[in-house]
A protein has these predicted regions:
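Juxtamembrane intracellular "pre-TM" segments in multi-pass secondary transporters
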Residues: 2-7, 189-223
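Extracytoplasmic gate region of multi-pass secondary transporters
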Residues: 32, 219-260
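Helix-breaking motifs and short loop linkers at transmembrane-helix boundaries and internal kinks
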Residues: 43, 75, 96-102, 249, ...
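Conserved MFS/SLC helix-loop-helix module at the cytosolic interface between two early adjacent transmembrane helices
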Residues: 62-101
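Cytoplasmic helix-loop-helix junction between adjacent transmembrane helices
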Residues: 106-147
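Helix-loop-helix hairpin linking two adjacent transmembrane segments in secondary transporters
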Residues: 140-187
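A membrane-interface helix-boundary motif in multi-pass transporters
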Residues: 161-173, 366-388
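C-terminal transmembrane helical hairpin of 12-TM major facilitator-type secondary transporters
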Residues: 283-329
Length: 409
């Protein structure tokens, strides 16, 4: 049931949700370019840094699974205003971390409280904005990803270079505090979904529905494709900053350009890839990009010694292809779900993707080593594994059975 708001209040709601997602995405993304500073400060290996990245995603994945048991038993505003401030506290804990162990625990907390914010935001949009305007409304919220890449990460790294690595997390915690105050005014009280079921009944219902989702062979193929699609990029991407500083001679203040140029190219290319997918077919476009993905992955890991402009070009192509696959890929995965269980399927898929990100980052970190000169070694091996995952997603995409109108695209 849709709860209609005035145009002005709806606009403020969407801006608030976009701001919430911006802080959540930035909190996750900023950890990757901080690799050089954190490995040096705490005296940790690339593998231990990979655990810092994967701690967030593993926690977010588990949080997503748990959320399916309770998210519909509370009002949307209450859920958001409980989890989001706790996410801000976790960001503050990251900024105050005096040791590697403290930071690991803070990242686990950030993932746990931040991992379900997007699901809550999407649910609020679905319950407030009529279907005929929902796509445009969701695009406002989803711009947080691009803005975090193009503006958020470079600005956060600017704070790092002029202050220290604690500064971005302090800034995120401050933004969360401001947005909580705004959300108190802009979020509607949505309680129409609440039902007077006993907790045990709700849990049993969830488990029964979960079983129905997991026994469908087509769903399992879609989950496998989703794992491979996400794994391909996250075996390599978390270590780009480490590699560029250790092997390619990038300075700390030059790393933001990787994310700035990559984000701009992604913003421009996303629209064209979306149009291409609609016209040529999602499966065709996804398979072509999945086949292409191993090339920029391997090129990125072997780029040391190239001119800086060439390295930035390679990283930008990698960002474009990696994010571009997600446009037709997620459409295929969504269309493969049994329409009667699509909500549960998509919630599980989100958790599966988070767990896959964590696994890929951890495996990539275990592969990497350092030589006597301090250069990263075997980065190319992580790219080969990521490329293999991308090729496997190509195979799995052709085996999905799509539902409804998606069969013709």
């Amino acid at each position: 049931m849709t709860t209609l708001l005035s145009p002005q209040r709806e606009r403020w709601l969407l801006f608030t949700l976009a701001g919430i997602q911006f802080t959540s995405v930035l909190d996750f993304m900023i950890m990757m370019p901080l690799g050089p500073q954190l490995t040096q400060l705490f005296g940790i290996s690339a593998g231990e840094f990979g655990l810092l990245v994967s701690a967030y995603t593993f926690s977010a994945g588990l949080s997503g699974l748990l959320a399916t048991t309770y998210i519909d038993r509370f009002g949307r505003k209450r859920m958001m205003l409980t989890l989001y401030p706790l996410f801000g506290v976790a960001a503050l804990a990251c900024s105050l971390a005096p040791s590697y162990g403290w930071l690991i625990l803070a990242r686990v907390a950030s993932g746990f409280f931040g991992g379900v914010l997007m699901a809550i935001s999407q649910t609020i949009v679905a319950e407030v904005v009529p279907f005929d305007r929902r796509g445009r409304a969701m695009s406002v919220v989803m711009t947080s990803f691009s803005v975090a890449t193009v503006a958020g990460v470079p600005l956060a790294l600017f704070l790092v270079s002029h202050f220290n690595w604690h500064a971005p997390f302090m800034a995120i915690a401050g933004m969360v505090g401001l947005l909580v105050v705004v959300a108190l005014k802009t979020l509607p009280s949505l309680k129409g979904h609440l039902q007077a079921h006993a907790a045990g009944d709700a849990t049993l219902s969830f488990l029964a529905n979960l079983r129905l989702v997991l026994i469908d062979p087509n769903h399992l193929k879609a989950f496998a494709m989703s794992v491979c699609m996400v794994f391909a990029g996250f075996a390599v991407v978390p270590y780009i900053a480490l590699y560029l500083q250790a092997n390619a001679g990038f300075k700390t203040e030059e790393i933001p350009y990787v994310y700035l140029y990559g984000g701009i190219c992604t913003l421009i290319s996303a629209r064209f890839i979306g149009l291409w997918s609609d016209r040529a077919g999602k499966a065709l476009v996804f398979r072509r990009l999945a086949l292409l993905m191993p090339l920029p992955l391997l090129a990125m890991t072997l780029s040391a010694g190239l001119p800086q402009w060439a390295i930035l070009a390679i990283s930008s192509v990698l960002f474009v292809v990696m994010s571009g696959r997600m446009i037709p890929g997620m459409a295929l995965i969504g269309a493969s779900a049994d329409p009667r269980r699509r909500g549960s399927f998509m919630t599980l898929n989100s958790a599966v993707q988070s767990l896959s990100m964590g696994l890929a980052a951890w495996i990539g970190g275990q592969i990497l080593g350092r030589d006597d000169a301090g250069n990263l070694t075997l980065y190319w091996a992580a790219a080969l594994i990521g490329g293999g995952a991308s090729l496997l997603s190509f195979v799995l995409a052709s085996k999905l059975r799509l539902h409804g109108e998606a069969r013709t695209t």
